[in-house]
Design a protein with these regions (language model features):
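Class I SAM-dependent methyltransferase SAM-binding "motif I" and its flanking Rossmann-like core
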Residues: 30-96
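Class I S-adenosyl-L-methionine
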Residues: 1-52
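A contiguous loop/helix-start segment that scaffolds small-molecule binding in enzyme catalytic cores
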Residues: 2-3, 8-11, 23-25, 94-184
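Conserved alpha-helix/loop element of class I SAM-dependent methyltransferases that forms part
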Residues: 186-201
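Generic structural signal for well-ordered alpha-helical scaffold segments
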Residues: 17, 43, 90, 196-200
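Short, acidic/turn-prone active-site loops that include or flank metal/cofactor-
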Residues: 2-14, 57-59, 76-83, 131-133
């Protein structure tokens, strides 16, 4: 069959089914097709299709290889196109030995560093990779305070190593509506979770 390589951003809902009536179709995505990828959109929209996935090397593996970070205990998160708070960043880092973040030019290294400093997680270490595999590739590592004013690279992943992770028990996560005053919560759930964790309660 003739293979057509299509740019995923130009696909409409009707183009793929029409093309598959006569052709095989290849969709190219960058990085790991099974992690925050367009593959999930295609699979969910067309569950009956016979799809063969050919994996590539993702940016998390590339970053880990640069700094010798193994991923057995890693937690994976994303600031790219997803809602987050400084508290949610800190809450993830507090609980895990290693936390990976997908970043963007708008939300990335600077926001992670500021969140870690805000929640007194200065004993952590940040590992940053930008433009990995490109000629403009750059990597950095250091304490969070070194990156609080850093510019956010557009193509970037960040890992944070926490030497003293502590799981946060379910009892910590009382909902915000348990702390209402005049119809508004007095504190945020993420703030309460990190404070209790830092107090070792």
């Amino acid at each position: 069959h003739r293979i057509q390589i299509l740019r995923m951003l130009l696909l409409s809902r009707l183009q793929l089914p029409t093309l598959l009536q006569t052709d095989s179709v290849a969709i190219l995505v960058s990085g790991d097709p099974l992690l925050y990828s367009f593959y999930r959109t295609v699979r969910n929209r067309y569950p009956d299709w016979d799809i063969t996935v050919i994996p590539g090397i993702g940016s998390l593996q590339l970053l880990g290889a640069k700094f010798g970070l193994t991923m057995e205990d890693a937690f994976i998160s994303s600031l790219h196109g997803k809602p987050y708070t400084a508290g949610s960043i800190a809450c993830a880092v507090v609980q895990h030995t290693l936390t990976f973040f997908f970043c963007s030019a708008k939300d990335g290294v600077r926001q992670i560093a500021q969140a870690l400093c805000q929640y007194q997680l200065s004993d952590t270490t940040m590992y940053i990779g930008a433009d990995l595999t490109y000629e403009t590739e750059q990597t950095w590592s250091g304490a969070p305070e070194q990156f609080c004013s850093a510019e956010n690279p557009a193509l970037c992943v960040t890992a944070v190593r926490n030497p003293n992770p502590k799981p946060i028990g379910a009892a910590v996560f009382l909902p915000d509506d348990a702390f209402l005053r005049n119809g508004a919560p007095m504190t945020k759930e993420e703030v309460r979770a990190v404070i209790i964790s830092k107090l070792r309660l």
